């Protein structure tokens, strides 16, 4: 589970990331990022009905949370991030999702230099 201080909780915070954030796309997901001026990075996860029914959407969000939790020690501070699942994510394995998130974090320059 992602620690509470690393979660975007308010709808208004997620809306700000959607409106003002910069985006990077991958066939499995979309990453939107906005600077938050804080000493931590926070995350939210979205899976719309295009991904599938409720069970499939919840699995997609669980996969994304687990992958971000794994990358969290290597992610720079001061960012609000929104990960939006795309339809292909429902059939993807944990390794594929991990690779996709890693690629997007690298392209967004969010991974610190000493990360693996």
Please give the residue ranges for each predicted region:
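Positively charged, solvent-exposed patches that mediate nucleic-acid binding
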Residues: 1-116
